[in-house]
Amino acid sequence: MAERANLVFHNKVIDGTAIKRLISRLIDHFGMAYTSHILDQVKALGFQQATATSISLGIDDLLTIPSKGWLVQDAEQQSLILEKHHHFGNVHAVEKLRQSIEIWYATSEYLRQEMNPNFRMTDPFNPVHIMSFSGARGNASQVHQLVGMRGLMSDPQGQMIDLPIQSNLREGLSLTEYIISCYGARKGVVDTAVLTSDAGYLTRRLVEVVQHIVVRRTDCGTTRGISVSPQKRTLPERIFIQTLIGRVLADDIYMGPRCIAIRNQDIGLGLVDRFRAFRTQPISIRTPFTCRSTSWICRLCYGRSPTHGDLVELGEAVGIIAGQSIGEPGTQLTLRTFHTGGVFTGGTAEHVRAPFNGKIKFNEDLVHPTRTRHGHPAFLCYRDLYVIIESEDIIHKVTIPPKSFLLVQNDQYVESEQVIAEIRAGTYTLNLKERVRKHIYSDSEGEMHWSTDVYHSPEYTYSNVHLLPKTSHLWILSGGSYKFSVVPFSLHKDQDQINIHYLSAERRYISRFSVNNDQVRHNLFSSDFSDEKEERIYDYSELNRIIGTGHCDFIYSAILHENADLLAKRRRNRFIIPFQLIQDQEKELMLHSHSGISMEIPINGIFRRKGILAFFDDPRYRRKSSGITKYGTLGAHSIVKREDVIEYRGVKKVKPKYQMKVDRFFFIPEEVHILSESSSIMVRNNSIIGVDTPITLNTRSQVGGLVRVERKKKRIELKIFSGNIYFPGERDKISRHSGILIPPGTGKTNSKESKKLKNWIYVQRITPTKKKYFVLVRPVTPYEIPDGLNLATLFPQDPFQEKDNMQLRAVNYILYGNGKPTRRISDTSIQLVRTCLVLSWDQDNKSSFAEEVCASFVEVRTNGLIRDFLRIDLVKSHIFYIRKRNDPSGSELISDNRSDRTNKNPFYSIYSNARIQQSFSQNHGTIHTLLNRNKESQSLIILSASNCFRMGPFNDVKYHNVIKQSIKKDPLIPIKNLLGPLGTAPKIANFYSSFYPLITHNQTSVAKYFELDNLKQAFQVLNYYLIAENGRIYNFDPCRNIFLNAVNLNWYFPHHHYNYCEETSTIISLGQFICENVCIAKSGPRLKSGQVFIVQADSIVIRSAKPYLATPGATVHGHYGETLYEGDTLVTFIYEKSRSGDITQGLPKVEQVLEVRSIDSISMNLEKRIEGWNECITRILGIPWGFVIGAELTIVQSRLSLVNKIQKVYRSQGVQIHNRHIEIIVRQITSKVLVSEDGMSNVFLPGELIGLLRAERTGRALEEAICYRAVLLGITRASLNTQSFISEASFQETARVLAKAALRGRIDWLKGLKENVVLGGMIPAGTGFKGLVHRSRQHNNILLETKKKNFFGGEMRDIFFHHRELFDSCFSNNLHDTSGRSFIGIEFNDS
């Protein structure tokens, strides 16, 4: 009884963790047997009390937290404000997503924290409360889902779904919430079916890698270890203790002169407490990494057995235990309910709050303006910043650490408890982050603008990928667009009044022209959209005006001037103009039926400089027979050397060499028959035959002469050469005359008579056998080429003279190269010469015209006749049309910046939409011509009243660069406006003349600031659009065949009695961008966002636009001024997000690490870290042997990194796995090296995978250095690269493994467990271990001097041992110097 009296009575609630602690203390104190006896009594007590209480769970026990309603309401309010900010362009999509997730995460966490106090106050004996908070059943997360809110879910890929589940399971879920819940929850099909098997397969692979690792020795004698430092607080206390307990020391631990622990002592709780108390130097512990046994492990490197707390027994199969320990939590945790831990929080940020109301003061030079990750403006401080908060009687000082955000401005008044700064937590950098790309898509179509300079990203210099250097807005100026199959053409002058309904979707876009006195007079109209299918044409005769050619150059045939009938054979890209001219000198040409000028334009519409515009086949140069074309004479070398007309991508181009004068050429006729191999030939090679000799059964020769038969591939070519045969006397005389042309008037060289030739002849040497040869003299038809038909006269000269110095000139060229055989196919004739019309234009430096133009045929209907015009635009860029094969209506655009876009609605299907819009407004508009700054091209804009919004009238508005007089004339013209909101609109054109050039200054404005500042002019002008009042803008920029839909312009008239929001008057300048809700006049309407289009004395017109915010480093797609369509990618943000902490996302990540698949973040971090290490080492030790140690350190470093990554995933789930299990696995993955050179050729092959220790030992035995490279094998590859082929074959690819093993004659020593199980032997583990293994002699511990100033703090000292020979040979003198000095220690934190 006396003993009982001394016991202390603890009156406390004991929960799961307390019981764990109690049990471990009991085991330490009383041992196993007694502890189990105590625990039996505790169990009996527990059951007895539970029965007496009759505890049970009912649905009424789930009490909802009362504060939930207003918390959720508050979060919704915040989300709404956030949505607005995003709409105004203050935050971008990524920031919005981040902030909304954090808002809901915080709400959910508040609710969770409320839960425990709520239960304690309202119902302390609630069964749910008792069970979950004691740890008996369920955890806080699960109860929170039952009575709080389910919160945010993540989808199976680990991305957060930003719509939170606000209900809890007690209230029941709505349909949407239920679907999200199924998508993200752990009970889905995905998890039960797929992930369980994944976890099982992971376990199988893990066990496969390490099944042969058994404890087979007490001590391997290593002197290496991994150092863990108690001083550095990089590790949480709990993990530090967990790392140390159960390990064995690799080195003596000194405290001053006193040794407090010796080498090979195992670490218990008492020793850890002593280490923590003394704050000793780094502690070096032994790990499986440092064990020197090749294929097993020793007791001391493994440490205590987790089951009974003593050193591990010999024969323990620790490999299989390790594999199971890592795989097992996976199978358990896949089916867990969802856990929202730490997603997107990016390290919990601590807030600094103001203690009382007052003014803030700090040094502004030490801070730098930036944006927080939520898009709020803030200041970033680089070093410690002192912030002073002053009120009337108190002064409070706060120190804010570096890298923190200051959320207030200098001299700002703050209220009590207001957040003034956000401090990044220390754990921030340790988080596993992955880089995610987020694409932002345009949700409207229109024209793109930037409000800042944009850099080309270096790897895509010539593409449309740009990098933003600073935070700025991208604007999409509104306006729809239509794509056209033909190039739209239109001829308008400035200030024209027009009314056109230009887009006629069903019919071709045909306008009517009448040609009078060489002036083109237009009646502009088109058919109205009515339900009737016939063509109804309205003629607005009062709109007739003489309109000169604007940007387009028309080249039209002179025939049009004479109003002669024009019959054009129409193809899509080519037509032929028949000759009907009655000039005498050309009459003979016209007799031939086939003659005619062909004009052809490449299918893509691109016409190159000096390209062929039209060609004419002269009938005088046609031949009916095959033959060979030759140029020039023997004396005059042929000028054109086998150059053909080069056709590439459908573009005909004449090379400059062609335009040299070939005054005459020669045609050598020959008869050619092409026969199949099987046909029987009735004549012999080199025989001479007469006319009409049968050659095969059904063909006869048309000329007589020498027969030559050649076999080519799968056919036989039989040629008949007409001409005379001579047998020359001496061989060398004739050799140089084989295959030459001899002009008339020369003597024959190969006969004794000197006869003069009358005609040209062609001499060719023929060798039927080796000794015999003879000469064949063949007749030749010479052709003279005159200057040719002057095609240029067909085209009037004026369009070329006026502009751009375009020239047409006729060029004759020969279709066949010198000495090239021409083949006649069936009954066609061969055209030898073609006369071409070459179009070129001057390329002087001032007008920077490209090498290419856009050309197209335009069909014009005049008085019932259809005329064809050729339209040529000199442009810089172009768009190709590619017709899809099966779909005639859809076409794709590929512009020259390589961005592909598919036109979703083909041309013919827009009829129904267009008709509805067409019926809306019929009013007049005004054309205005915009001039580009470098005067390359003009463009038109037509504006009308119904599509602008207007602000005004203002009295005090200041304008930039605007002449007041031009504003004061404000003639209002009446406009017939059927459905527009207003009856009047100012005559827009007047103001354009003075303001329009200003639009090129790219100004922007920032919401909330009333001073709207000018930005510097950065870019080219607006693009050129033609706006029709019926709701479309026609893009008149000739480089794109795209018509833009109407710009939404709105007119605003505020009331006259108004006051300004600020005393300073708002400055509005033309072309400036205004964000939504910028207040210009107090009583005026709230503006929509847009670009100021027109400024007048009392009002402004704004073209509506949508801003998108982009932060530095974002990638902008598309060019400035480019037309974008809905759904096009606009910007790509790259941002870092914390890995989702859920184990189901965790398992694939564990597997990625173990299988060494490269994920961006892992490979980046590891490689960078290793590079950094190698640099450090060489800096510390000097180059030569820094590399040797660098290799060792690389392996050690990557091993530690892998262990930490795997631990991280499990710890985030509250799963405790001892490091040594993971270390055993990682050791197997990293223990192989790749033999790189043939330095070891007598032992290993290059490219062979061998164990690291084996390579080192072989190197020492052979006394030569080995070249090898450390490799990370994945667990699958490691399982297939073991010493036992039976184990490999039973894992995967059985046939391949066995076949290889047979070829190599491998021997399996049956050292592992699996081989023995397969063959039915006794496994070498446990009791079977002693019988099988003969003790190999224990290695004597290598005695190395371990002084206090040891090398690398006990980390790498045995490098000397491994590479002693290498060191001795190279550095025998250096070592003596270095041994005396102390080296800088390098430590690996086992964190």
Swiss-Prot record:
Gene Ontology biological-process annotations: DNA-templated transcription
Places the protein is found: Plastid, Chloroplast
Known role: DNA-dependent RNA polymerase catalyzes the transcription of DNA into RNA using the four ribonucleoside triphosphates as substrates.
UniProt-listed Enzyme Commission number(s): 2.7.7.6
Pfam annotation, one family: RNA_pol_Rpb1_5
Family from the record: Belongs to the RNA polymerase beta' chain family. RpoC2 subfamily.
MF GO annotations: DNA binding; DNA-directed RNA polymerase activity; zinc ion binding
Cofactor: Zn(2+)
Protein name: DNA-directed RNA polymerase subunit beta''
Organism from which the protein derives: Gossypium barbadense (Sea Island cotton)
Keyword vocabulary terms for this entry: Chloroplast, DNA-directed RNA polymerase, Metal-binding, Nucleotidyltransferase, Plastid, Transcription, Transferase, Zinc
Residues the record lists as binding Zn(2+): 220, 291, 298, 301
Catalysed conversion reaction: RNA(n) + a ribonucleoside 5'-triphosphate = RNA(n+1) + diphosphate
Entry-linked InterPro entries: DNA-dir_RpoC2_beta_pp, RNA_pol_beta''_euk, RNA_pol_Rpb1_3_sf, RNA_pol_Rpb1_4, RNA_pol_Rpb1_5, Rpb1_funnel_sf
Cofactor notes: Binds 1 Zn(2+) ion per subunit.
